[in-house]
């Protein structure tokens, strides 16, 4: 019975703890999801260039 008040106090402390962001962030506090979006966009651009370059007429110089 002595543990019950301690248990209740611990539950109250846990419930009142500050919440945290669900999205992981980098050192600059930028959501990591934005970096994943940039990676997807870059991959899509490179894939489009490869499809375009298979014909050989629309490849960018370089």
UniProtKB/Swiss-Prot annotation:
Tissue specificity comment: Expressed by the venom duct.
InterPro entries, per the entry: T-conotoxin (IPR031565)
Signal sequence bounds: 1-19
Source organism: Conus pennaceus
Zinc listed as a keyword: no
Domain comment as written in the entry: The cysteine framework is V (CC-CC).
GO MF annotation: an example: toxin activity
Similarity annotation: Belongs to the conotoxin T superfamily.
Protein name: Conotoxin Pn-B02
Pfam families found in the cross-reference section: Chi-conotoxin
Domain of life the protein comes from: Eukaryota
Sites bearing Alanine amide, chain numbering: 61
Alphabetic keyword roster: Amidation, Cleavage on pair of basic residues, Disulfide bond, Secreted, Signal, Toxin
Positions of the propeptide segment: 20-49
Gene Ontology terms: cellular component: extracellular region
Keyword match Membrane: no
């Amino acid at each position: 019975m002595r543990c019950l008040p301690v248990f209740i106090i611990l539950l109250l402390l846990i419930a009142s703890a500050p919440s945290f962001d669900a999205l992981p962030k980098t050192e600059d506090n930028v959501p990591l999801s934005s970096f994943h979006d940039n990676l997807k966009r870059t991959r899509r651009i490179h894939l489009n260039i490869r499809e375009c370059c298979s014909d050989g007429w629309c490849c960018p110089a370089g």
